[in-house]
């Protein structure tokens, strides 16, 4: 077993060797290096064919028509293109958008930008377990609501939203529904031929494909229109200009093909490992599960350890690559906005750790993790005056701390 152990698969994944090997065939002179938009020679035709194959592989995993897949530079761009693109196109119908407080920053900050441009956004607070109350969502819908953006799986706590029911609610009212599926694709079944979802964002690097490539699903029936945010040569049916990065697209396609074949057995394996991890640490005193095991993705476990500083815990766990909050926000020392939205106090939010498991995680690594976490929590609490006071029965909430 090699240290450190990587348990941050929700931040990114290593490229699968099968994917890397495939990508190498599309880079050099003796490979398929052409521009898929070059229609006048074989180099272009071969590149275009490779892109078509990848588009098919992606659409097959999610039950879409290949013509509904638009390649982007990643899920952040897909979220931007979906939300800004739909808002700009349909603004004559209304200027009201609904999302939730626990969305990824790529959705929240896009909505904030639209607010600056005159749109009105309602941010729904989730229930304590992270699930959106559908009655609240319904109550927030208005005649001028044009777009709802609610994610499938939360990147920090792993809870799964009921996108099927939300889709039905939106379709019945003629509201466009966008789903950020970055964390769910390849981990939960998605069938867009059945779901009433109009726009869906995907990433390559969360499921063993390369970074820098993603896709946006744009429904054809009933047809959804979006305004391009990137202008140029009119690639991707005018929705996203820019020369297609064939090697990255092929890599994403291959990653989606592999995950389609292996998803069922792999998710059962990961669910078993996640449960093993939780069962190994859940009897530690003052430990809290964030999210919902029953309604959660099989690969994410987010836990708070009361009376332990999150940063000191991460340092103590230096043999584990884990995160507190998401990679996109862990650079700041602010407690996780997702956990705060669940109604958690700052102290508990600060002591949270996200374990996210993946394709190369082993049982041996999980057992090592359990042992290390138990020892580290014990050691850090021995050093903590707060823990001592808690054990003596002092109500820490009633203490008035002196501010320096």
Swiss-Prot record:
PROSITE patterns per the UniProt record, alphabetical: AA_TRANSFER_CLASS_5
Q: What is its EC number?
A: 2.8.1.7
> Which InterPro entries does the annotation name?
Aminotrans_V_dom (IPR000192), Aminotrans_V_PyrdxlP_BS (IPR020578), Cys_deSase_IscS (IPR010240), Cysteine_dSase (IPR016454), PyrdxlP-dep_Trfase (IPR015424), PyrdxlP-dep_Trfase_major (IPR015421), PyrdxlP-dep_Trfase_small (IPR015422)
Which processes are annotated in GO (biological process)? [2Fe-2S] cluster assembly
Pathway entry: Cofactor biosynthesis; iron-sulfur cluster biosynthesis
Q: Binding of [2Fe-2S] cluster: at which residues?
A: 328
Entry keyword annotation includes Ribonucleoprotein: no
Modified residue annotations for N6-(pyridoxal phosphate)lysine: 206
How does this chain assemble?
Homodimer. Forms a heterotetramer with IscU, interacts with other sulfur acceptors.
* Family membership: Belongs to the class-V pyridoxal-phosphate-dependent aminotransferase family. NifS/IscS subfamily.
- The protein's name is Cysteine desulfurase IscS
Organism the protein comes from? Salmonella paratyphi C (strain RKS4594)
Identify the gene encoding this protein: iscS
């Amino acid at each position: 077993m090699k240290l450190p152990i990587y348990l941050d698969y929700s931040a990114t994944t290593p490229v699968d060797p099968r994917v890397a090997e495939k990508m190498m065939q599309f880079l050099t002179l003796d490979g398929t290096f052409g521009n898929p938009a070059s229609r006048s020679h074989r180099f272009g035709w071969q590149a275009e064919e490779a892109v078509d194959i990848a588009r098919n592989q992606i659409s097959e995993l999610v039950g879409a028509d290949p013509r509904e897949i638009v390649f982007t530079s990643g899920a952040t761009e897909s979220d931007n293109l979906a939300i800004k693109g739909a808002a700009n196109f349909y603004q004559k119908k209304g200027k009201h958008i609904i999302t939730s407080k626990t969305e990824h920053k790529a959705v929240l900050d896009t909505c904030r930008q639209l607010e600056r441009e005159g749109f009105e956004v309602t941010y729904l607070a989730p229930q304590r377990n992270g699930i959106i109350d559908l009655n609240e969502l319904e109550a927030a819908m208005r005649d001028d609501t044009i777009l709802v953006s609610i994610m499938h799986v939360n990147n920090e706590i792993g809870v799964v939203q009921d996108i099927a029911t939300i889709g039905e609610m939106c379709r019945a009212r003629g509201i466009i529904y966008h789903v950020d599926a970055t964390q769910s694709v390849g981990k939960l079944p998605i069938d867009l031929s059945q779901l009433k979802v109009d726009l869906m964002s995907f990433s390559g690097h969360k499921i063993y494909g390369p970074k820098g490539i993603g896709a946006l699903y744009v429904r054809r029936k009933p047809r959804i229109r979006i305004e391009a945010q990137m202008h140029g040569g009119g690639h991707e049916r005018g929705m996203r200009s820019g020369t297609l990065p064939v090697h990255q697209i092929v890599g994403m396609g291959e990653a989606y093909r592999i995950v389609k074949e292996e998803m069922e057995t792999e998710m059962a394996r990961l669910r078993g490992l996640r449960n093993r991890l939780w069962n190994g640490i859940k009897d530690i005193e003052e430990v809290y599960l964030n999210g919902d095991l029953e309604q959660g993705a099989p690969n994410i476990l987010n836990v708070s350890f009361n009376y332990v500083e999150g940063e000191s815990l991460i340092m103590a766990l230096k043999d584990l690559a884990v995160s507190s909050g998401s990679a996109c926000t862990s650079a700041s020392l602010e407690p996780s906005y997702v956990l705060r939205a669940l109604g958690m106090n700052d102290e508990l939010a600060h002591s949270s750790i996200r374990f996210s498991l993946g394709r190369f995680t082993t049982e041996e690594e999980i057992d090592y993790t359990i042992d290390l976490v138990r020892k580290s929590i014990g050691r850090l609490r021995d050093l903590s005056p707060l823990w001592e006071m808690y054990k003596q029965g002092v109500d820490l909430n009633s203490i008035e701390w002196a501010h320096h």
